[in-house]
C-alpha cells in the first residue's frame, strides 16, 4: 500500500510559533527534542521533578526548567518523554490535573494510549511523533543539517488541527528533512513491540546466544564462537542497513551467499514463523502489555531473575575480555 511521505516543503513550521512546547523528561529523546525545538526557534520549557539530576544539564543547555506541573500549566503542547513504566504515575500525579482544554499531548510511542495506561481527557488533542532513531542520532543528524525519518499519528483531533501540530513538531526536530509517514497509534505500537521482541532484541539475542552455545558445546573456543556469532554481526547489519538485503548479498562471499540461501530457512523455519505469529497475537490481544504492567507493579522479581540469567551468560564475560583488546574503539 502506497504511503504519503511528508517533507520539509509540505509542512508549515509557523504553526508552532507563539506556542509553548513542554518536554516532560530530559533523557535521550527529551534532550534531543528540546534542543532541536529550541534551535528551530520554538519556545521550549522542560518539566522535571524537584531534585532531578537532569535539571543542571537542561539549564546548561539554555533551557527553562520548571517542575512538571508548572511546565504543563505554562504550555500549549506537552511531550511526554518518559519511559512507559513511569509515564502513568507522572501523568496522574503531575499532568492530568493541570491540563486545560485545547492543549495537545504528544507521545513518541503509542504504548500508553493504545493499552490505556493513560486515558486523556476528551477536550485535548492527542498525537504521536516517533523518530525512527535513538535520541543522540536525532540530535546529531539535526545539528549536521540532516534528520532521521519519523512517524506521526493522531489519536484525538479535538481541535481539527492535531495533524498539523504533529507535522510541525516533526519538522522542528528535523524528521521531515528525511521524511515522515502517517500511521496510527495501534499500528506503531504493535509493529514496534513485535520488532523488538521477535527480531531486534529478543530474536537477535536468542539467536546469537544459541549460535555461541552450539559452537562452544561442540568443542570450539569461546573466543572463536564470540567472533563468529556476535562480533561480526555488526558488519552484516551495517551492510543491510546501508544497502538492503540484496545489497548485503552482493558484498559477501559466494560461500556466505550459498549458506544464507540454503541454511537460513532451516533456522528460521515454519515453526519459528508460527511462533512469531503467536507473539504478534499476544501483542494485539493486549496479553503482553497486561503481563508487562503486572510485572512492573508486582516488584519486577521475575524481570530481575531473567535479567540476571541473561547477564550471566558466558558470552558476556568472553565479550568483555575481547572488547578490551579492540584498541580502535
Model regions and ranges:
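A short, basic/flexible loop-to-alpha-helix module at the beginning of a structural domain
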Residues: 1-18
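Glycine-rich adenosine-cofactor-binding loop
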Residues: 19-33
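Rossmann-fold NAD(P) dinucleotide-binding segment
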Residues: 67-118
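Rossmann-fold dinucleotide-binding core
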Residues: 106-197
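Active-site-proximal catalytic alpha-helix in oxidoreductases
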Residues: 160-164, 173, 179-218, 223-241
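Interdomain hinge/lid region at the active-site interface
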Residues: 210-213, 217-218, 243-303
Amino acid at each position: 500500500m502506497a504511503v504519503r511521505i511528508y517533507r520539509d516543503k509540505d509542512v508549515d513550521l509557523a504553526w508552532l510559533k507563539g506556542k509553548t512546547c513542554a518536554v516532560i523528561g530530559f533523557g535521550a529523546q527529551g534532550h534531543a527534542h528540546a534542543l532541536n525545538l529550541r534551535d528551530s526557534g520554538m519556545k521550549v520549557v522542560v518539566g522535571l521533578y524537584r531534585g532531578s539530576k537532569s535539571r543542571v544539564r537542561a539549564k546548561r543547555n539554555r533551557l527553562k526548567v520548571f517542575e512538571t506541573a508548572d511546565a504543563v500549566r505554562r504550555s500549549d503542547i506537552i511531550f511526554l518523554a518518559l519511559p512507559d513504566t513511569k509515564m502513568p504515575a507522572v501523568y496522574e500525579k503531575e499532568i492530568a490535573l493541570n491540563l486545560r482544554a485545547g492543549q495537545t499531548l504528544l507521545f513518541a510511542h503509542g504504548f500508553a494510549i493504545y493499552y490505556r495506561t493513560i486515558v486523556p481527557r476528551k477536550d485535548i488533542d492527542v498525537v504521536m511523533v516517533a523518530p525512527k532513531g535513538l535520541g543522540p542520532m536525532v540530535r546529531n543528524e539535526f545539528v549536521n543539517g540532516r534528520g532521521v525519518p519519523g512517524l506521526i499519528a493522531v489519536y484525538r483531533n479535538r481541535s481539527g488541527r492535531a495533524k498539523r501540530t504533529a507535522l510541525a513538531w516533526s519538522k522542528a526536530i528535523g524528521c521531515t528533512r528525511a521524511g515522515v509517514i502517517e500511521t496510527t497509534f495501534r499500528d506503531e505500537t504493535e509493529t514496534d513491540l513485535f520488532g523488538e521482541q521477535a527480531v531486534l532484541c529478543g530474536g537477535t539475542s536468542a539467536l546469537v546466544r544459541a549460535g555461541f552455545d552450539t559452537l562452544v558445546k561442540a568443542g570450539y573456543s569461546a573466543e572463536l564462537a564470540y567472533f563468529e556469532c556476535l562480533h561480526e554481526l555488526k558488519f552484516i547489519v551495517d551492510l543491510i542497513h546501508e544497502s538492503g538485503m540484496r545489497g548485503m548479498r552482493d558484498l559477501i562471499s559466494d560461500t556466505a551467499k550459498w549458506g544464507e540461501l540454503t541454511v537460513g530457512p532451516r533456522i528460521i523455519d515454519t515453526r519459528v514463523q508460527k511462533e512469531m505469529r503467536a507473539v504478534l497475537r499476544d501483542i494485539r490481544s493486549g496479553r503482553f502489555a497486561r503481563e508487562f504492567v503486572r510485572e512492573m507493579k508486582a516488584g519486577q522479581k521475575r524481570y530481575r531473575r531473567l535479567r540476571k540469567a541473561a547477564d550471566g551468560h558466558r558470552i558476556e564475560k568472553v565479550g568483555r575480555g575481547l572488547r578490551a583488546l579492540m584498541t580502535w574503539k
